[in-house]
Swiss-Prot record:
Residues annotated as domain Fe2OG dioxygenase: 259-356
The name this protein goes by in its record: 2-oxoglutarate-dependent dioxygenase AOP3
Protein's UniProt keywords contain Iron: yes
One MF term in the entry's GO annotations: 2-oxoglutarate-dependent dioxygenase activity
InterPro entries: DIOX_N, IPNS-like_FE2OG_OXY, IPNS-like_sf, Iron_ascorbate_oxido_reductase, Oxoglu/Fe-dep_dioxygenase_dom
Gene Ontology biological process terms from the UniProt entry: glucosinolate biosynthetic process
Superkingdom as given in the UniProt entry: Eukaryota
Described purpose of this protein according to its UniProt entry: 2-oxoglutarate-dependent dioxygenase involved in glucosinolates biosynthesis. Catalyzes the conversion of methylsulfinylalkyl glucosinolates to hydroxyalkyl glucosinolates.
Tissues where this protein is expressed: Not expressed.
Length: 411
């Protein structure tokens, strides 16, 4: 029965045997394109990050999250929602811009310790550097597969990286109201607080939504969660809440339905397990590593959920809305969520996201626009897209990307 369950494509991206121009490179290039066109993501078998480094990063994350709250709250950034975020002690995350640059990694640990922590800084920087090399390989493969090699250097030079270190704690039971309450968000100016949100029909749903927003995420203070796992899409409320799937943001949902009688026990239990609701990323690409405990689930075009199981030396490569727009819709940004089901176990995940630099105009290369594939999105500055997320129209749109720059959007 298990063998019939849908699975993401698994592609070997070992840099020891994968060289540009080789027959393997050509084969992998084709596989990457097909996987992204079909699923918007894939699992990658890698050797760029050693098991020793993976273990060291996990220990570093455990040390970071074990710090006193007042220390963790010093992880603040100039832009709101890009620093430390905690929700009821059940989920936390750190944000590190340009984590692949040692100086920036040092700045991060200096926020937490008076003298910093050079060992952890170097470990984070090395980890981010290895994942960044992998990301650049993937994006090179993508652009080559569409015959736009001339665009590779410009594209790679127009982006930067942000790392997210994340911790989820599963509930001790399935009490779906146990986690609704106050949150702490130190790097933010405001919260998307969905306690007792009221939907369009006037029904109150007891959901706590805290959104950690950076350069490329929607802070959605009107999200309705709980009437089925995909309520964001079905009720015309933007589901683009990003965390483990967004370059600059983390949305943490801890709590579920408290007042909707139409929701069955099974659906309510699923919602109670959500550490992150169904959403798409805003980044170009994301590389996610799940440490030992699974939780990430990806939605297929057929509407089925694929639960991605952690495996040694594997990561998940996922496309975001920015890549979808750049590639003229050829590559979708898939809906995904985090659902922690193992009781009394802590889940750690680390992710690196590539994002367009401020001022760079995202515009599909002419080679990707033809009669079969008419232009799907207007050129736009990523910062303008981010600002649109904060408007009422941006929050309410089923697809913020489509509403902002889709050719059919009334703009």
């Amino acid at each position: 029965m298990g063998s019939c369950s849908p699975q993401l494509p698994l592609i070997c991206l070992s840099d020891q045997t994968l060289k540009p121009g080789s027959s393997k490179w050509v084969k992998v290039r084709s596989d990457v394109r097909k996987a992204l066109e079909d699923y918007g993501c894939f699992e990658a078998k890698i050797d760029q990050v050693s098991m020793e480094l993976q273990g060291s990063v996990l220990k570093a994350m455990q040390e970071l999250f074990a710090l006193p709250t007042e220390a963790k709250q010093r992880n603040v950034c100039p832009k709101p929602f890009t620093g430390y975020l905690s929700h009821n002690g059940l989920s936390e995350s750190f944000g590190i811009k340009d984590a692949n640059i040692l100086e920036k990694a040092h700045e991060f640990t200096q926020q937490l310790w008076p003298e910093g922590n050079k060992s952890i800084s170097k470990m984070i920087q090395l980890y981010a550097e290895k994942l960044a090399e992998l990301d650049m390989m993937v994006r090179r493969l993508i652009l080559e597969s569409y015959g736009i090699e001339y665009f590779i250097d410009e594209h790679l030079n127009s982006t930067y990286y942000r790392m997210r270190l994340m911790k989820y704690i599963a509930r001790p039971d399935n009490d779906i109201t146990a986690a609704v309450g106050a949150n702490v968000d130190n790097g933010a100016n405001d919260n998307a607080d969905g306690d007792a949100n009221v939907n369009d029909d006037g029904a109150s749903i007891g959901v706590k939504v805290n959104v950690d927003v950076g350069d490329d995420v929607n802070d959605n203070d009107s999200v309705n969660i709980g009437v089925g796992v995909d309520i964001n899409v079905e009720t015309n409320v933007n589901g683009d809440l990003d965390a483990e799937a967004n370059g600059d943001a983390t949305a943490w949902v801890v709590g579920a339905v408290s007042g909707n009688a139409s929701v069955g026990a099974k659906e309510a239990n699923v919602d109670a397990e959500l550490g992150l609701p169904s959403h798409t990323d805003k980044s170009l690409t994301g590389i996610i590593y799940q440490h030992q405990i699974d939780g990430l689930e990806v939605k297929t075009k057929e509407g089925k959920w694929i639960r991605v199981k952690p495996a040694p030396n594997t990561v998940i490569v996922i496309a975001g809305d920015a890549l979808c727009a750049l590639m003229n819709g050829r590559i979708p940004s898939p809906y995904h969520r985090v659902r922690v089901t193992e009781k009394k176990k802590t889940r750690y995940a680390a992710a690196l996201f590539s994002n367009p630099k401020e001022g760079y105009i995202i515009d599909s290369p002419k080679e990707l626009v033809d009669e079969k594939h008419p232009r799907a999105f207007k050129p736009f500055d990523f910062v303008d897209l981010f600002n649109f997320y904060h408007t009422e129209a941006g929050r309410r749109a089923p697809s913020t990307l489509q509403a902002f720059c889709g050719v059919s959007a009334g703009k």
